[in-house]
Amino acid sequence: MTQRLRIALIAHDQKKDDMVAFARAHEQALSRYDIVATGTTGGLIQDACPSLNIHRVKSGPLGGDQQIGAMIAEGTVEVLIFFIDPLSPLPHDVDVKALTRLGSVYDIPMALNRATAEKLVRALD
């Protein structure tokens, strides 16, 4: 049995609505993959897209970013879609840098904004 690709979905507070809209627009495509998301983002997506089975980890500031980073390092998350808000001060900026660094170290496809995420999901489909 082949394992399904696992995609991580994360969004900063000011980008959560955009992530929900993205997930809703691509619900059919995303349903073919295992989805992991940080707590609040995952809950919002699950409410908007009930057909998606989302594994929720802790909220980002409570360690969810690190949990997903560990999954990247273990090879159990193969794609990262992280809608970053570049205009808001990030109190957990170190966590963001650590997560995107791991995405680069382990050479996984990574989208940090909706335009790139749109292209990435179409390429996976």
Curated annotation (Swiss-Prot):
InterPro entries: Methylgl_synth, Methylglyoxal_synth_AS, MGS-like_dom, MGS-like_dom_sf. Substrate binds at residues 12, 16, 38-41, 59-60, 92. One of its GO terms (molecular function) is methylglyoxal synthase activity. Keywords: Lyase. Gene3D superfamilies: Methylglyoxal synthase-like domain. GO terms for cellular component: cytosol. SMART domains: MGS (SM00851). It is an enzyme of class 4 (lyase). Belongs to the methylglyoxal synthase family. NCBIfam families: MGSA (TIGR00160), PRK05234.1 (NF003559). HAMAP family: Methylglyoxal_synth. This is Methylglyoxal synthase. The lineage of its organism: Bacteria, Pseudomonadati, Pseudomonadota, Alphaproteobacteria, Hyphomicrobiales. The gene is mgsA.
